[in-house]
Amino acid sequence: MGAAYKVFGKTVQPHVLAISTFIATAAVASYFTTKPKTKNEGKNSSALSQQKSGESSNSDAMGKDDDVVKSIEGFLNDLEKDTRQDTKAN
């Protein structure tokens, strides 16, 4: 066997110590390179204040739903007109 190190009273092989050192270094580096989340916190707080004041945050989604419904109704009306014209032609 080769040399081994004693860490906190346990015998640790050199390759395990090297791998754990690389992992710890990568973890610390990634922790300090992440950007703070101050922008997201500001957005969340404004959404909470809108909900508390009674304003609906889903108003845009409801407007989009209305547009989709109108589009579907228009498509169905056009389809009915086309089928009527086809039946009259036959």
UniProtKB/Swiss-Prot annotation:
Annotated region described as Disordered, given as residue ranges: 34-65
InterPro entries: ATP19
Carbohydrate-modified residues: N44
GO cellular component, one term: mitochondrial membrane
Transmembrane intervals: 15-34
Gene Ontology BP terms: calcium ion homeostasis; proton motive force-driven ATP synthesis
Main location class: mitochondrion
The entry's keywords: Glycoprotein, Membrane, Mitochondrion, Transmembrane, Transmembrane helix
Species the sequence originates in: Saccharomyces cerevisiae (strain ATCC 204508 / S288c)
The protein, known as: Uncharacterized protein YOR020W-A
Biased composition (Polar residues): 43-60
Topology class, membrane: Single-pass membrane protein
Compartments it resides in: Mitochondrion membrane
